[in-house]
Amino acid sequence: MPETTPRRIALVADARHYVGPELSRMFARRGHDLALGDPDPELVAELEALGSTVLAVEKVSNIAKPENSQKLVDAAIARFGHFDAAVAASGQIIPGSFIDSSIDQLEKIVDGCLYAPYHFLKAVIPPLVAQGSGQVLVITSAAGARPTPGASLYSSVRAGATMLTRNVAGEVARKNVQVNAVGTNFMDFPEFLEATGANDPAVREMFEKQVPMRRLGRMDEFASFCAPFLDGTSTFTTGQYVSYAGGWV
């Protein structure tokens, strides 16, 4: 039988990478129990020490695979009976010009940046609609909010993911389900640094100069920014997209 608890239940699709660990900490500090995709065992212990009940679901964080988000949702409902909030980030960063691009590159980007949020939304939306409440946040990219020289395919597909999210929000707003998107760029995390070469201090400085705030974003502050879209304190915003890129958009 599912556990019954007055605490809110949050689902984090990938709790191991990108902002997933910081989002998990944010939820724990705000009194949530958690269903997490592929969390590090040390993170689970930390969250439990903060008072959260943690359900760790293995081998589901790659949400480009259509079955993985559904596995996480099914596990969360089996354990807790429901969930109140769900968040996912995905992506496949392949820079380069349009002229030099290939259909193989486009297919990889679509798989990581459009199919992934599609599968996630298909899994999390129906149970939230059925229960008549819930909050969903899809993390896309600020590159989808403006033309991005050097990343034309990536920018275009990210724009599609953002608009998919906003369209879903319009469909389910009357069911008291909020669905929003936030797009990042210039964030300090390994995949960005590797894809752009910004592990090199000189290259990093070049990127920082493109950001009006003249630095890269931190994951802890980004998790705090995401909180009102997910923690139940603000439930009258849906269908919105916000960039989180230090003023670049």
Language-model segments: which ranges?
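Short C-terminal tail/terminal secondary-structure segment
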Residues: 4, 146, 209, 227, ...
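Substrate-binding pocket helix/loop in short-chain dehydrogenase/reductase
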Residues: 97-98, 102-110, 203, 207
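Canonical Rossmann dinucleotide-binding motif of NAD(H)/NADP(H)-dependent dehydrogenases/reductases
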Residues: 2-35
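Active-site helix of classical SDR
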Residues: 121, 157, 165
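Alpha-helical segment proximal to the catalytic Tyr-Lys
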Residues: 126, 170-174, 235
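A glycine/serine/threonine-rich, flexible loop-to-helix segment
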Residues: 174, 186-210
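Residue(s) in the substrate-gating loop at a strand-loop-helix junction
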Residues: 141
